């Protein structure tokens, strides 16, 4: 998995109040995003710039983030983000501290490879799940999960339960469909004639 370097400035957190709301609004107007780092010994509240997180957020790739908050370096993953519903602007980010002895759950992009038998017979290959949830130590999680579909016939599906990746535990439902070769009208017509 790729590493993304991100710098943040620590911030003091006060109990929920009008002063805190004003401070958060001022941060956002100043192109800063409030963030929190948890999962370690203590919870750390900090801010990052919008420009710094743009390449981290608006990409299909996944990263482990090397956070530098006031000089202290920590490895983390993006756990959650809150967006403004109308402008789609990032309002808040949550980071989970990771270590080599504790497994984390992440969504990893799925990539299909090969030419399915069902497609050769006139079907259409469709990807139902773009990402799969996996549980593993963060440095064992790949950038993408590659699934070979050469053996997938016409009208057949590939379910999560049929997949296995070394060192990863799949967290999705076993009967969830990852991809399928669907019958097209032309393929149905050919089957009816034949």
Curated annotation (Swiss-Prot):
One of its GO terms (cellular component) is cytosolic large ribosomal subunit. One of its GO terms (molecular function) is 5S rRNA binding. One of its GO terms (biological process) is translation. Keywords: Ribonucleoprotein, Ribosomal protein, RNA-binding, rRNA-binding. InterPro entries: Rbsml_bL25/Gln-tRNA_synth_N, Ribosomal_bL25/Gln-tRNA_synth, Ribosomal_bL25_b-dom, Ribosomal_bL25_C, Ribosomal_bL25_long, Ribosomal_L25_dom, Ribosomal_uL5_bac-type. Pfam families: Ribosomal_L25p, Ribosomal_TL5_C. It comes from the Bacteria. This is one of the proteins that binds to the 5S RNA in the ribosome where it forms part of the central protuberance. PANTHER family: RIBOSOMAL PROTEIN L25/GLN-TRNA SYNTHETASE, ANTI-CODON-BINDING DOMAIN-CONTAINING PROTEIN, RIBOSOMAL PROTEIN L25_GLN-TRNA SYNTHETASE, ANTI-CODON-BINDING DOMAIN-CONTAINING PROTEIN. Part of the 50S ribosomal subunit; part of the 5S rRNA/L5/L18/L25 subcomplex. Contacts the 5S rRNA. Binds to the 5S rRNA independently of L5 and L18. Belongs to the bacterial ribosomal protein bL25 family. CTC subfamily. This is Large ribosomal subunit protein bL25. It comes from Parabacteroides distasonis (strain ATCC 8503 / DSM 20701 / CIP 104284 / JCM 5825 / NCTC 11152).
């Amino acid at each position: 998995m790729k590493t993304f370097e991100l710098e943040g400035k620590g911030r003091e957190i006060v109990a929920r109040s009008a002063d805190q709301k004003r401070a958060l609004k001022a941060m956002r107007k100043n192109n800063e995003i409030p963030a929190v780092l948890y999962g370690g010994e203590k919870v750390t509240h900090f801010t990052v710039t919008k420009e710094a997180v743009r390449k981290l957020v608006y990409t299909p790739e996944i990263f482990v983030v090397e956070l530098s908050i006031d000089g202290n370096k920590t490895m983390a993953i993006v756990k959650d983000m809150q967006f403004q519903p109308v402008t789609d602007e990032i309002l808040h980010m949550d980071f989970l501290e990771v270590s080599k002895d504790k497994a984390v759950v992440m969504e990893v992009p799925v990539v299909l490879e090969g030419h399915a038998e069902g497609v050769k017979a006139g079907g259409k290959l469709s990807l139902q799940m773009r990402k799969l949830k996996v549980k593993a130590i963060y440095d064992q999680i790949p950038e993408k999960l590659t699934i070979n579909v050469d053996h997938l016939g016409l009208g057949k599906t590939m379910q999560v339960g049929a997949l296995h990746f070394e060192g990863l535990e799949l967290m999705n439902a076993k009967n969830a469909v990852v991809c399928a070769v669907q019958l097209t009208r032309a393929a149905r017509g050919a089957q009816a004639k034949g």
